[in-house]
Amino acid sequence: YGGTLVPYYLDEERSWSMDVEHVKKQLNEARANGKNVRAIVVINPGNPTGNLLSDENLLEIAKFCADEKLLLISDEVYQENVYAEGKTFTSMRKIVLDAGLEKRVALASFHSTSKGFYGECGRRGGYMELVGAWDPDVVAAILKLASIALCPNLAGQVVVSMVMDPPKEGEPSYELFCKERDDILASLKRRSIALGSALNALEGVICRPSDGAMYCFPNLVFPQKYMDECKEANKVPDVEYCTRLLNQTGIVTVPGSGFGQRPGTWHFRTTFLPSEEDIKGVAVKLTDFHNSFIAQYK
């Protein structure tokens, strides 16, 4: 519909937090170039970075949107996937309401049945909640569009209902529900640590801890010989690396350049969804490939 992306970059050195001053600089440059910036998208916990934004950072973002009159779109589909000790997910809705910003910020929050510990991707369930300073005419238009669309699939509606209203203490299935939930999340945490440790043991690789979501997003420092070769062949370094990794090991990753990483840096996104036993094999294959790659360009 003619929209234009204005990128901003997370601060990798500060656990992939949002640098609001940097975001403001990007906004001002876009406006100076004639772009009418209308909204900002925040993903928390992060994809592809696996970070969890602090309450302080979320409040900074909410105030920034209030000051700049930007619609705040908060993608929170990984809210159940939090693994870092002492950290918990806080919704942007809570941040906005607790700070008394609901008259200054229009917030759209998104959640899904595809992630979390339930992972019901094929059910196609999810919802959007509108909070705060929305123009009533805009809300009416959104409701009209929803009303004339086809009804959401029944299975998706059922799963959304179950996610929003899980078993409660005293109900027959409560103990089993808690055990299955806790076992799944504990296993994901162990897999996250195992894969992150394997990546950090590789030469030229730095992988920040995955506080949440389902991903590791390691930083790659490539040998200069390899960089020169890619430049000569007009190839993107992280794309070429991921392609070779796929062809030689069968491991599927996504180049960081596909996500709009900071210029001059290279990453790839990988998931720790395979079973704990399979993750060990992934780590071995990845290690062998990378060591061979480094040896080739030394």
Where are these regions (language model features)?
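PLP-dependent class I/II
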Residues: Y1-K298
